[in-house]
Amino acid sequence: MQSVLAYHDAQMDYASVDRDGDGALEYAQKIFSTPGKHDGLYWAQDDSGQISPLGPSFGKAIADEEWHGYRFRILHGQGPSAPGGAYSYLIGDKMSRGFALIAWPAKYNVTGVMSFMISHEGQVFEKDLGPEGEKLALAMKRFDPDDSWQEVAADQDQE
Protein backbone atom coordinates (compact mmCIF):
# COMPACT_ATOMS: atom_id res chain seq x y z
CA MET A 1 0.00 0.00 0.00
CA GLN A 2 2.90 2.36 0.64
CA SER A 3 3.79 2.14 -3.05
CA VAL A 4 0.39 3.46 -4.16
CA LEU A 5 0.66 6.30 -1.63
CA ALA A 6 4.12 7.10 -3.04
CA TYR A 7 2.57 7.14 -6.52
CA HIS A 8 -0.05 9.65 -5.33
CA ASP A 9 2.64 11.92 -3.86
CA ALA A 10 4.76 11.61 -7.01
CA GLN A 11 1.83 12.62 -9.23
CA MET A 12 1.13 15.67 -7.06
CA ASP A 13 4.81 16.62 -7.29
CA TYR A 14 4.90 16.01 -11.05
CA ALA A 15 1.87 18.24 -11.66
CA SER A 16 3.31 21.10 -9.62
CA VAL A 17 5.65 22.00 -12.52
CA ASP A 18 4.92 22.58 -16.22
CA ARG A 19 7.10 19.68 -17.40
CA ASP A 20 6.58 20.16 -21.13
CA GLY A 21 6.50 23.96 -21.30
CA ASP A 22 3.00 24.21 -22.77
CA GLY A 23 1.67 26.47 -20.00
CA ALA A 24 -0.58 23.78 -18.49
CA LEU A 25 -0.04 21.62 -15.43
CA GLU A 26 -0.78 17.95 -15.97
CA TYR A 27 -0.24 14.53 -14.44
CA ALA A 28 2.13 11.90 -15.80
CA GLN A 29 0.57 9.26 -18.03
CA LYS A 30 3.36 6.79 -17.45
CA ILE A 31 5.65 5.72 -14.65
CA PHE A 32 8.95 5.57 -16.57
CA SER A 33 9.97 8.57 -18.68
CA THR A 34 11.09 8.27 -22.26
CA PRO A 35 14.93 8.24 -22.15
CA GLY A 36 16.21 11.82 -22.09
CA LYS A 37 12.79 13.26 -21.18
CA HIS A 38 10.85 14.08 -18.02
CA ASP A 39 7.48 12.79 -19.25
CA GLY A 40 6.94 10.12 -16.58
CA LEU A 41 7.20 9.88 -12.81
CA TYR A 42 10.72 8.46 -12.91
CA TRP A 43 13.71 9.53 -14.98
CA ALA A 44 17.37 8.71 -14.59
CA GLN A 45 19.52 11.36 -12.98
CA ASP A 46 20.67 13.85 -15.60
CA ASP A 47 22.33 17.27 -15.74
CA SER A 48 19.00 19.15 -15.50
CA GLY A 49 19.25 19.24 -11.71
CA GLN A 50 15.67 17.96 -11.44
CA ILE A 51 15.06 14.88 -9.33
CA SER A 52 12.30 12.61 -10.59
CA PRO A 53 9.15 12.58 -8.43
CA LEU A 54 9.61 8.88 -7.64
CA GLY A 55 13.20 9.51 -6.57
CA PRO A 56 16.47 7.76 -7.37
CA SER A 57 15.71 4.51 -5.51
CA PHE A 58 12.92 3.75 -7.97
CA GLY A 59 15.56 3.54 -10.71
CA LYS A 60 16.31 -0.01 -9.62
CA ALA A 61 12.91 -1.00 -10.98
CA ILE A 62 12.52 -1.83 -14.64
CA ALA A 63 9.53 -0.91 -16.77
CA ASP A 64 6.95 -3.72 -16.85
CA GLU A 65 8.63 -5.45 -13.91
CA GLU A 66 7.45 -5.74 -10.33
CA TRP A 67 8.25 -3.26 -7.57
CA HIS A 68 8.07 -4.54 -3.98
CA GLY A 69 6.17 -7.57 -5.26
CA TYR A 70 3.54 -5.60 -7.17
CA ARG A 71 2.83 -4.50 -10.72
CA PHE A 72 1.26 -1.15 -11.55
CA ARG A 73 -0.93 0.41 -14.21
CA ILE A 74 -2.03 4.02 -14.60
CA LEU A 75 -5.74 4.48 -15.32
CA HIS A 76 -6.95 7.39 -17.49
CA GLY A 77 -10.45 7.94 -16.14
CA GLN A 78 -12.94 6.97 -13.50
CA GLY A 79 -16.25 5.15 -13.44
CA PRO A 80 -19.62 5.84 -11.83
CA SER A 81 -18.65 4.32 -8.46
CA ALA A 82 -15.76 6.77 -7.97
CA PRO A 83 -16.20 9.95 -5.94
CA GLY A 84 -17.32 12.60 -8.44
CA GLY A 85 -18.80 10.07 -10.88
CA ALA A 86 -17.60 8.93 -14.29
CA TYR A 87 -15.31 11.06 -16.44
CA SER A 88 -12.06 10.91 -18.39
CA TYR A 89 -8.94 12.39 -16.82
CA LEU A 90 -7.80 13.43 -20.30
CA ILE A 91 -8.40 16.75 -22.00
CA GLY A 92 -7.13 16.14 -25.49
CA ASP A 93 -3.92 14.19 -24.98
CA LYS A 94 -3.12 15.75 -21.57
CA MET A 95 -4.03 14.06 -18.29
CA SER A 96 -5.06 17.16 -16.36
CA ARG A 97 -8.37 16.23 -14.74
CA GLY A 98 -7.06 13.61 -12.32
CA PHE A 99 -5.16 10.35 -12.09
CA ALA A 100 -5.51 6.83 -10.75
CA LEU A 101 -3.47 3.66 -10.37
CA ILE A 102 -4.19 -0.04 -9.93
CA ALA A 103 -1.57 -2.21 -8.19
CA TRP A 104 -1.78 -6.01 -8.04
CA PRO A 105 0.48 -8.77 -6.72
CA ALA A 106 3.09 -9.89 -9.24
CA LYS A 107 2.74 -13.44 -7.91
CA TYR A 108 -0.64 -13.97 -6.30
CA ASN A 109 -0.45 -15.47 -2.80
CA VAL A 110 3.37 -15.18 -2.86
CA THR A 111 4.11 -11.45 -3.10
CA GLY A 112 0.64 -10.45 -1.94
CA VAL A 113 -3.07 -11.17 -2.08
CA MET A 114 -4.75 -7.77 -2.11
CA SER A 115 -4.87 -5.39 -5.07
CA PHE A 116 -4.99 -1.64 -4.46
CA MET A 117 -6.40 1.38 -6.28
CA ILE A 118 -5.82 5.06 -5.60
CA SER A 119 -6.95 8.24 -7.35
CA HIS A 120 -6.10 11.92 -7.13
CA GLU A 121 -8.53 12.09 -4.18
CA GLY A 122 -5.96 10.10 -2.16
CA GLN A 123 -8.34 7.36 -1.01
CA VAL A 124 -6.90 3.85 -1.20
CA PHE A 125 -9.19 0.90 -1.91
CA GLU A 126 -8.33 -2.80 -1.70
CA LYS A 127 -9.77 -6.02 -3.05
CA ASP A 128 -8.69 -9.62 -3.47
CA LEU A 129 -8.90 -10.07 -7.25
CA GLY A 130 -7.89 -13.72 -6.91
CA PRO A 131 -5.41 -15.72 -8.98
CA GLU A 132 -6.66 -14.03 -12.18
CA GLY A 133 -5.89 -10.60 -10.69
CA GLU A 134 -3.35 -9.65 -13.32
CA LYS A 135 -5.79 -10.31 -16.16
CA LEU A 136 -8.50 -8.32 -14.36
CA ALA A 137 -6.15 -5.42 -13.54
CA LEU A 138 -4.88 -5.19 -17.11
CA ALA A 139 -8.46 -5.09 -18.38
CA MET A 140 -9.36 -2.15 -16.12
CA LYS A 141 -9.67 1.14 -17.96
CA ARG A 142 -11.06 3.31 -15.16
CA PHE A 143 -10.80 3.86 -11.43
CA ASP A 144 -14.17 2.47 -10.35
CA PRO A 145 -14.18 1.16 -6.77
CA ASP A 146 -17.65 -0.38 -6.51
CA ASP A 147 -19.04 -1.98 -3.34
CA SER A 148 -16.72 -4.98 -3.75
CA TRP A 149 -13.71 -2.73 -3.00
CA GLN A 150 -12.98 -1.73 0.61
CA GLU A 151 -11.56 1.65 1.58
CA VAL A 152 -8.28 1.29 3.47
CA ALA A 153 -7.80 3.45 6.56
CA ALA A 154 -5.03 6.01 6.05
CA ASP A 155 -3.12 4.78 9.11
CA GLN A 156 -3.20 1.13 8.05
CA ASP A 157 0.37 0.05 7.24
CA GLN A 158 0.59 -2.81 4.79
CA GLU A 159 2.25 -3.52 1.46
Please give the residue ranges for each predicted region:
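A short, surface-exposed interaction/processing loop segment used at functional sites
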Residues: 114-149
